[in-house]
Amino acid sequence: MTAMMKAAVFVEPGRIELADKPIPDIGPNDALVRITTTTICGTDVHILKGEYPVAKGLTVGHEPVGIIEKLGSAVTGYREGQRVIAGAICPNFNSYAAQDGVASQDGSYLMASGQCGCHGYKATAGWRFGNMIDGTQAEYVLVPDAQANLTPIPDGLTDEQVLMCPDIMSTGFKGAENANIRIGDTVAVFAQGPIGLCATAGARLCGATTIIAIDGNDHRLEIARKMGADVVLNFRNCDVVDEVMKLTGGRGVDASIEALGTQATFEQSLRVLKPGGTLSSLGVYSSDLTIPLSAFAAGLGDHKINTALCPGGKERMRRLINVIESGRVDLGALVTHQYRLDDIVAAYDLFANQRDGVLKIAIKPH
């Protein structure tokens, strides 16, 4: 008799539901992980709304914290019963992209029957959980290429302390790294959702001494101060570009980090840059972007625009866990709610509609 599990599956645009599915069978290079905590991401909401196409019946979610239930015959150095995380991006490190230093793009492109952009192709990169294979909002998940992607959780750290590592922390910190921040820099971070808050914390770790956090939610701006912001601006109460330019004496910021994914925030991120400044783009854009020439000076202002997808792999996860374990960053304030997997539909409703001050929801299968 086939062993079954509960999983949150994509049914159709606007509908994710809890269903019974077989517990995955693993191959020699895989691991079966029993999920103890996972969460819902903004990208999952894009899937729910039909803005990003996935197969019907696919288990969604890509942020796993759990316990190794079973190891493939070729996986060494781990043990059953060990607490682990895996990155949202699970590269196998065999592709040209990975060997060329961009492991998050491992996997390149797969045809999607014209359902999305990229000239009829679906950009998958190394994002497999909840995209190309069943994801983590379930009782169990198959972790592919486990040798390259499983990272042990140190004793003394809770699930909630490491829950941001697989995606939100990795993405936000990459935004700070890609901003080319130098010691003493001034940085503007546009949007203080979970990724933007992590970018704010990352900018502080990278050496920025003046961090300007921008959002339209005062509660999130309060949390941004805890993450390291020196100045907070509510865009509902001011002209953000004018305020940033005043704060910098008309010079502009050394770097800006765009963490929302809208035309407006992208433009503002450009307009506040000093000549030669760097825009680090993290937002998930749902439509084409227009780059306004008026946001540039001659020679396009010598500006640099860097983009990034969430880095994955066990070494990246190990480094992020080191930061958490050191106490230099505490992301506990980002976990605002907890739901059982049985109540995943209600959790999606809360998260998608951004009620009750929600930032991240810890989803517990048991």
Curated annotation (Swiss-Prot):
CDD domains: NADP_ADH (cd08285)
Family: Belongs to the zinc-containing alcohol dehydrogenase family.
Catalyses which reaction(s): a primary alcohol + NAD(+) = an aldehyde + NADH + H(+); a secondary alcohol + NAD(+) = a ketone + NADH + H(+); (R,R)-butane-2,3-diol + NAD(+) = (R)-acetoin + NADH + H(+); an aldehyde + NAD(+) + H2O = a carboxylate + NADH + 2 H(+)
Name of the protein described by the UniProt record: Alcohol dehydrogenase
Function: Multifunctional alcohol dehydrogenase exhibiting NAD(+)-dependent dehydrogenase activities for 2,3-butanediol, ethanol and acetaldehyde, and reductase activities for acetoin (NADH-dependent), and diacetyl and acetaldehyde (independently of whether NADH or NADPH is the reductant). The rate of oxidation of 2,3-butanediol is much higher than for the oxidation of ethanol. Has acetaldehyde dehydrogenase activity leading to acetate formation. May function in the release of excess reducing power in the absence of exogenous hydrogen acceptors such as oxygen.
InterPro entries in the record: ADH-like_C, ADH-like_N, ADH_Zn_CS, GroES-like_sf, NAD(P)-bd_dom_sf, PKS_ER
EC primary class: oxidoreductase
Pfam entry (one): ADH_N
Upregulating conditions: By limited oxygen supply.
Keywords in alphabetical order: Metal-binding, NAD, Oxidoreductase, Zinc
Organism: Cupriavidus necator (strain ATCC 17699 / DSM 428 / KCTC 22496 / NCIMB 10442 / H16 / Stanier 337) (Ralstonia eutropha)
Protein EC: 1.1.1.1, 1.1.1.4, 1.2.1.3
Manner of cofactor binding, per the entry note: Binds 1 zinc ion per subunit.
Subunit relationships: Homotetramer.
Keyword hit for Transcription: no
Binding site for Zn(2+): C41, H62, E63, D167
Any GO molecular function: aldehyde dehydrogenase (NAD+) activity
Cofactor(s) of this protein: Zn(2+)
Presence of the UniProt keyword Metal-binding in the record: yes
